[in-house]
Amino acid sequence: GLPTCGETCFGGTCNTPGCSCSSWPICTRD
């Protein structure tokens, strides 16, 4: 049910709710 993370986040921000850029440059689930 949760949105899939995985977009690139070169700017350091993720558009997908609940995702973070801690594994730069790919968004991963918080």
UniProtKB/Swiss-Prot annotation:
Family, per entry: Belongs to the cyclotide family. Moebius subfamily.
How are the domains described in the entry? Answer: The presence of a 'disulfide through disulfide knot' structurally defines this protein as a knottin.
Pfam families to which the protein is assigned, alphabetical = Cyclotide
Task: Tell me which SUPFAM superfamilies the record gives.
Answer: Cyclotides
| Cross-link Cyclopeptide (Gly-Asp) per UniProt, renumbered positions | 1-30
Key words of the record: Disulfide bond, Knottin, Plant defense
Q: Per the UniProt entry, what are the Gene Ontology biological process annotations, in alphabetical order?
A: defense response
Q: What is this protein called?
A: Kalata-B10
Q: Which domain of life is it from?
A: Eukaryota
**Post-translational modifications reported in the UniProt record:** This peptide occurs in both cyclic and linear forms. The linear form contains unmodified Trp-24, the cyclic peptide occurs in two forms with unmodified Trp-24, and with Trp-24 oxidized to form oxindolylalanine. Oxidation is enhanced by exposure to sunlight.
Functional note: Probably participates in a plant defense mechanism.
- List cystine links: 5-19, 9-21, 14-27
Q: Which InterPro entries match?
A: Cyclotide, Cyclotide_moebius_CS, Cyclotide_sf
